[in-house]
Amino acid sequence: MSGFTPASSSVVVTLTTALALAPTAAFAVDYLSADEAAKLMFPQADRFEPRTLAFDAEQLQRLQAAGVSPRSARWQVRVAQRDGATLGYVVVDDVIGKFELITYAVGIGSDGAVRQVEVLSYRESHGHEIRLPAWRRQFVGKDASAPLRVGEDIANISGATLSCSHVTEGIKRIVTVIDLARHAGSLA
């Protein structure tokens, strides 16, 4: 006798079904912490001062007029400093890929231009190519005046269209928020 019984076949079917229905979060990978990303983006910084930006109704309308959905009136920013001088800003954000959250950080210089983008956690089963340095480097030097649109100044990655689009939209939102805060004196 082979040892294969109707009961064991039921277990195989149950396990196969459970694996097929397992959430895509099983693919989650954490690459960097927010602190590690900040130090990577601004290695010369001797301090990262946490700041909360709080926008009023008029400022939120300005963000919407700039074509971004602010999602919140409050933003957490780490101000990178060396000897009291501001080097730039680090903002950590989450966007939905296809089904799961993507956590990323954007380093922005004191001039308002993107210095670096790092993916901190990626939870999708596909589209992890957005972590490739070549794709992330496309954002370097872009500021609030850049279109920041997939298919225009940002290349798409086949199989990662939603991840590319949503991270790009998030970065556009962040550079616009930082631009507004810089010009309002909120980061001085």
Show where each model-derived region lies.
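Bacterial N-terminal signal peptides that target proteins for export
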Residues: 2-14
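Flexible, solvent-exposed loop/hinge segments and secondary-structure transition points
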Residues: 26-157, 161-165, 169-188
